[in-house]
Amino acid sequence: MEYLYTERAHLMCPGMSFGITAEVSAPFDEKRIKDSFAVLAQAHPFLKALLGHDRRSNAYYYDITEISKTELIIKKKMLADLEDAEILREFERLTGYEWNLFNEGMLKASAWKIGETGERTGFLLVFHHLLTDGRGALGLAQELAEYYARGKKPEYAPERLISAENTFPDKNRMPLISRMLVNTANSDWKREKHDPPDYSRYRDFAGEYIKSNKPFHALSRRSREEVKAMTFSCRENGITVNDLLIAQMMTEEGADKIIIASDLRSRLPGYNSGSLGNYSTAFSIEIKKKHKDIYELAKAIHKKVQKTLNDPAALYLILNCYESLEPPLLDASFISVRGCYNSKAAKFIGTMFFGFASPSGHSITNLGKTESVSMTKAYFIPPASPAIKKTLGILTVNGEMTICTSERLHIQMGATGDKERGFHIDSPKQKY
């Protein structure tokens, strides 16, 4: 049985669902679609899981059942291509409320006919963050495409999560100040003697929060030629494409700090290859010095990124915080900041560590590049964390890069946005 450990940070935090869209080079076949998701569930136990709770220990776990818990929706409407606005509208519908994970699975999927005759099939996979991270989601989408188009079955990959016994590499100890703050918050929490936050009460509050804080999504594209030019210029300057994208975001948003997601699979000895679960961290890069040249800014970013990647204490900082905080204190951090729970200790952590008081941060998650005959197109819809103002989700498939923006809008309770969700081709402002 797998228990929530560092994943606990995603349990009582709204807006943490995200999506992968995929266009598969095989005709629409409803029976084949249903069979494909059944096959995925046989390979990945978490697709058959609900949320479980041990009241005595207040531990949450993945309660694996006998059947798939994926909610599959077969759409009748035919779409011209994967960039149809209908897909983003469907994502916003499926993420427009807080899922009840005691009764609902952690994956919801929709499927459409793509093309004039349905000669291709389009999928939207919507993941709760407790199921997996972006890299795991992309892997599942690739397995779906390979089985649906070519009949290639995924290998059985039971999940083996980060745990107290299966923890991080050496030299990842938190800095002294962070340890002191965490220890103080834990002590204050114990002195407050609160009952643990109730999941159902959290869901009621989170549902209202989501209604009044709907994110807006938009897409932009970089053609194969543009991606090639970008890659060449980055190599010439000794930086990565991601360094350049971060520099562009800093420049366009006027931001000094960007939060970056980083995959840890190759660093975790306990990771079971191909399995679902969360095996990523996040860290921030701050550049206060102004740079007129975007490549000089990207070079400064590159140095800071590489320094963090080579410093376990910095790389694992946020995961160490999740691991070290009292679990109910972690549960209460968001709702305490938002006034639904009265804990000074949790409010302090939610404000100072996680930034829940106001969504002012910027972040970027790049799932890299992949080549696939079966999955001809895809893009990544990043989560809209309540701590983040704007997030970029980046995925390059068969040489074409798609950037999806999740930007949180502050609107009145019960109102709905009237902006058209959909695909637009955004010409790059930077010439390469």
Segments from the language model and where they lie:
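Short, well-structured alpha-helical interface segments that form or flank functional binding sites
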Residues: R135, G139, T240, L244, ...
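Acyl-thioester-dependent acyl-group transfer interface
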Residues: M1-A59, L82-L107, G254-Y432
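A generic structural signal for alpha-helix starts
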Residues: P27-F28, L131-R135, I239-T240, K292
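Non-catalytic, low-complexity flexible loops and terminal extensions
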Residues: M1-H10, F18-T21, L131, R135, ...
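Gly/Ser/Thr-rich phosphate-binding loops and adjoining beta-strand/alpha-helix segments
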Residues: C13-R32, N103-L124, F205-P269, M401
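Hydrophobic/aromatic-lined pockets within catalytic cores
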Residues: T132, A145-K152, R235, M249-G254, ...
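Acyl-thioester-dependent condensation/acyltransferase catalytic cores
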Residues: A41-R135, G139-Q142, E146-R150
